[in-house]
Design a protein with these regions (language model features):
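Conserved protein kinase catalytic core
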Residues: 34-36, 144, 186
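Conserved non-catalytic scaffold segment of RNase H-like nuclease domains
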Residues: 4-121, 125-126, 133, 157-175
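Short, glycine/acidic-enriched loop or turn micro-motifs at the edges of active sites
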Residues: 29-33, 141, 183
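Acidic, divalent-metal-coordinating active-site segment for phosphoryl/phosphodiester hydrolysis
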Residues: 176-187
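Short alpha-helix plus adjacent loop in nuclease-associated cores
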Residues: 137-154
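Acidic two-metal-ion nuclease catalytic site recognized across multiple nuclease folds
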Residues: 1-16, 165-166, 185-201
Length: 201
């Protein structure tokens, strides 16, 4: 393990709860499909979650140039990325490199965060992984644990729309990368503070 990896591992032991983090970065990516073997990234978005706010003014947002994979025409209705947008996007490796530089040492938050990180590492073509080996938290698990604390017999849904509805979080641009990243950030704040959330412009 590299020295950098060792430092990240040590910090992960020191802070095992997302509620202890002074700042998280809520990440979401849009892809050509959900098949990890063939999918390609179309867009990357991330927003800082700091204090009681999702800080949209400091967001990271990039459109990525897809390669050979075809974009599902039906999916365009949701992620709203036209072929012309994707054609003029950044090369995947450049987009991911810029994201990693922007992210720094901050821990990640997301929905199915493991899939997103795997896709980013593959797009960067960095053998052996480790590109995003810092702390990461999945809103599904955070939500599940909180619901089971309230009712051990509960069987909380793991569907994002259900989580948002249960937490009274309005869907903001669902199925766009920045919209979903924002929604997950607001869901986390709802779980942490159990009071109204707001987006900082």
């Amino acid at each position: 393990m590299s020295l950098r990896g060792l430092r990240r591992w040590w910090r992960s032991l020191a802070s095992v709860s997302p509620y202890d983090e002074p700042e998280l970065v809520s990440l979401d990516i849009e892809t050509t499909s959900l098949d990890p073997k063939s999918a390609e990234i179309l867009s990357i978005a991330a927003v800082p979650v700091r204090g009681r706010q999702v800080v949209l003014s400091e967001r990271f947002e990039r459109i990525v140039r897809a390669g050979a994979a075809e974009v599902d025409p039906e999916a365009v209705k949701f992620h709203r990325l036209l072929p012309s947008d994707i054609e003029h996007g950044l090369p995947p490796q450049q987009a991911v490199t810029e994201f990693v530089a922007w992210l720094g040492e901050r821990p990640l938050l997301g929905y199915c965060i493991g899939f997103d990180c795997m896709m980013l590492e593959r797009a960067a073509q960095w053998a052996g992984g480790g590109l995003l080996d810092g702390r990461r938290f999945d809103i599904r698990e955070i939500y599940r644990r909180r619901m089971l604390q309230r009712n051990p017999d509960d069987h909380p849904s793991q569907v994002l729309d259900d989580i948002l509805t249960a937490l009274d979080v309005p869907p903001v641009g669902r199925h766009t990368a920045v919209g979903d990243a924002t929604a997950v950030g607001l869901a986390f704040l709802a779980l942490k503070y159990a009071r109204p959330r707001r987006v900082a412009s």
